[in-house]
């Protein structure tokens, strides 16, 4: 069985960026239906089909979205009749993700979880706690088909798209971890969600936009997060960017640009051969105009590749007078890559030139590098490569999730200004 990328302009070759068909082998049938995949009316129909009053679905939804109760914590669901809990939870909260490994660093303020889906696909999410907010970086695909050579995820290829519920589950888990004080810093509240984990979000357009609506909607419909705390990244799938502008979702759009010229960007971001810099930025400005939201321009600083002052000038020229902010990311190391992050002096020079040209610029305060949880490092690597392991239980014994068992600077992470 094959499946194609969910591009609104039709399938494209994510590895070369050329307009040909992209196929991948699915490991199994679609993930089980989960309440996060369903509208409120659809959930109520499920309850009625089980011989229960429709409002039982609302009760289950409130436990999940508002109380953040695990489906295996049936004793906490005292408003559900005991004989109805099993059928309702089996139908509305099936097992989707099982934690295969959990790693932490930054004095316990950063936690990466590797998840295994029911069909064996692997994905990762990262929770990061800052003094003024808590952010979760979620995956939208298992793997990635965009083929960017400096990104570990892209080098592993694409396994499949994630379902809406598989995306939402990563967020609900993060909210639960913070509420239950399982992360350093005491009890907290999830404030930001960034679609910057594994995968190209806009290549899984339908599931990602549905997940955004679930995250924004109030309980029992959804999690009730602020749309302004949500960020969707893209390497530049132009038709999907334009489509997103019309969705009525005032989320932040982050464009992974990495080069101001087509010659270099063709090498760094292969999809650029399909949609070059001018088209990507035109779609970004359209998004900013329609939504009123400032676009974040993501730019990985690679030593001797894209960090010269001439390219800073070229970037400033492209962004002059636009509703945009540049988020510079010192390249994070990935296995097999000879590229390195720009030296601090080079970073400062790049920032200085952009700021001299009037461009709002920050440098990401990278989190999670030592556990391969930083930007471009997510690859669901084997547990043996990890440096510090909090939990490395076998998948079979790990507690499943959902089982009847940004701020100034980068919206994704903390930022610092180099002076």
UniProtKB/Swiss-Prot annotation:
Sequence positions that bind S-adenosyl-L-methionine: 199-200, 233, 256-258, 332
Localization (cell): Cytoplasm
Active site per the UniProt annotation: 124, 375
UniProt region (Disordered), positions on chain: 1-21, 383-419
EC number: 2.1.1.192
PROSITE patterns recorded: RADICAL_SAM
Keywords of the record: 4Fe-4S, Cytoplasm, Disulfide bond, Iron, Iron-sulfur, Metal-binding, Methyltransferase, rRNA processing, S-adenosyl-L-methionine, Transferase, tRNA processing
Presence of the UniProt keyword 4Fe-4S in the record: yes
Cited NCBIfam families: rRNA_mod_RlmN (TIGR00048)
UniProt-recorded name of the protein: Probable dual-specificity RNA methyltransferase RlmN
Source species of the chain: Frankia alni (strain DSM 45986 / CECT 9034 / ACN14a)
């Amino acid at each position: 069985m094959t499946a194609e990328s969910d591009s609104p302009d039709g399938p494209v070759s994510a590895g070369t960026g050329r307009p040909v068909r992209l196929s991948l082998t699915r490991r199994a049938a679609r993930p089980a239906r989960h309440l996060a995949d369903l509208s409120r009316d659809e959930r109520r129909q499920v309850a009625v089909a089980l011989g229960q009053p429709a409002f039982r679905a609302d009760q289950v939804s409130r436990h999940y979205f508002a109380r953040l109760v695990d489906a295996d914590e049936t004793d906490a669901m005292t408003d559900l009749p005991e004989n109805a809990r099993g059928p309702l939870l089996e139908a509305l909260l099936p097992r989707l993700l099982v934690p295969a490994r959990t790693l932490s660093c930054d004095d316990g303020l950063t936690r990466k979880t590797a998840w295994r889906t029911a069909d064996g696909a692997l994905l990762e999410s990262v929770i990061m706690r800052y003094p003024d907010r808590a952010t979760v970086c979620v995956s939208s695909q298992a793997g990635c088909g965009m083929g960017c050579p400096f990104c570990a995820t892209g080098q592993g290829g694409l396994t499949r798209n994630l379902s809406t519920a598989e995306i939402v589950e990563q967020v609900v888990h993060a909210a639960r971890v913070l509420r239950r004080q399982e992360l350093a810093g005491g009890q907290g509240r999830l404030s930001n969600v960034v679609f910057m984990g594994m995968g190209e979000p806009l290549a899984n357009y339908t599931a990602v936009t549905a997940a955004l609506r679930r995250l924004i909607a109030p309980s029992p419909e959804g999690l009730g997060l602020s749309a302004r705390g949500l960020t969707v990244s893209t390497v530049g799938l132009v038709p999907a960017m334009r489509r997103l502008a019309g969705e009525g979702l005032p989320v932040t759009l982050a464009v992974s640009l990495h080069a101001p010229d087509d010659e270099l960007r063709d090498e760094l971001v292969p999809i650029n051969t399909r949609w070059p810099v001018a088209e990507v930025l035109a779609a970004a400005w359209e998004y900013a105009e329609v939504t009123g939201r400032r676009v974040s321009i993501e730019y990985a600083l690679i030593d001797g590749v894209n960090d010269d002052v001439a390219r800073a000038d070229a970037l400033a020229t492209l962004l002059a007078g636009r509703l945009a902010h540049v988020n510079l990311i010192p390249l994070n190391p990935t296995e097999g890559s000879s590229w390195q992050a720009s030296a601090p002096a080079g970073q400062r020079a790049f920032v200085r030139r952009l700021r001299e040209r009037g461009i709002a610029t920050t440098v990401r305060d990278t989190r999670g590098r030592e556990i391969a949880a930083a930007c471009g490092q997510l690859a669901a690597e084997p547990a043996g490569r990890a440096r510090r392991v909090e939990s490395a239980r076998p998948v079979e014994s790990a507690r499943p999730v959902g089982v009847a068992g940004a701020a100034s600077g980068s919206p994704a992470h903390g930022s610092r200004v180099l002076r």
